């Protein structure tokens, strides 16, 4: 993969995570001085890192995989080799997980110099990122396997991922939500 492709592939999602951290952390952080005894930007940083992992893995195994399957017909070409369909799907899982984990690790590296990594336990974050990214890569690929056309991803993104992102407790304490909203968040 060339440098330009890497930048076009990884850059926008990484910039989006940095933008969330800067806009929400510094913007709302100017009004919300602390949450649970820490600064607002410190509060949201781990959640933004986790969301970068989630969205990176999901994007790779939803829209991007759909295009590889139905538009570019990469899967058809791959199974004409000694690879089985299972091999190709596992490769998609692993690439989606790799991409999601890369976002998390790079984002963690950006957080550290700004004092947003509060514990040495953060050294285990890459492992958590890989597990989370693999989980979301499998979820994305599973949905993609049932999608008949690319418009079906609107349901997946706006009906499942966006509520999960917004109700997950990234931007405000999860326990402060009403009971019905906490149920949505736990789902």
Predicted segment positions?
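Transmembrane helix-boundary elements of multi-pass transport/secretion proteins
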Residues: 3-69, 116-125, 151-155, 176
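Hydrophobic alpha-helical transmembrane segments of multi-pass membrane transport proteins
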Residues: 16-24, 41-113, 159, 165
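Hydrophobic alpha-helical interface/terminus motif in multipass membrane transporters
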Residues: 27-28, 32, 65, 75-78, ...
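Transmembrane helix segments
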Residues: 28, 144-187
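Transmembrane alpha-helical segments that form the membrane-embedded catalytic/substrate-channel core
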Residues: 53-61, 133-142, 166-170
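Membrane-spanning helices that line or support transport/gating and their immediate boundary helices
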Residues: 60-64, 68, 138-145, 176, ...
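Alpha-helical transmembrane segments and their short interhelical loops
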Residues: 85, 89-158, 162
């Amino acid at each position: 993969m060339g440098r330009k492709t890497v930048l076009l592939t990884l850059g926008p999602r990484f910039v989006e995570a940095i933008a969330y951290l800067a806009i929400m952390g510094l913007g709302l952080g100017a009004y919300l001085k602390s949450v649970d005894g820490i600064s607002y930007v410190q509060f949201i940083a781990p959640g933004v890192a986790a969301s970068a992992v989630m969205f990176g893995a999901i994007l790779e195994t939803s829209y991007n995989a759909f295009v590889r399957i139905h538009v570019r017909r990469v899967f058809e070409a791959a199974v004409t080799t000694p690879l089985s369909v299972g091999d190709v799907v596992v490769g998609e899982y692993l690439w989606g997980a790799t991409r999601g984990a890369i976002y998390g690790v790079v984002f963690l590296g950006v957080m550290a110099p700004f004092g947003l990594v509060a514990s040495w336990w953060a050294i285990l974050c890459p492992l958590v990122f890989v597990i989370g990214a693999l989980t979301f890569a499998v979820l994305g690929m599973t949905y993609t396997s049932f999608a008949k056309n690319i418009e079906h991803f609107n349901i997946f993104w706006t009906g499942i991922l966006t509520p999960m992102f917004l109700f997950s407790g990234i931007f405000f304490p999860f326990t402060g939500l009403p009971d019905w909203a906490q149920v949505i968040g736990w789902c």
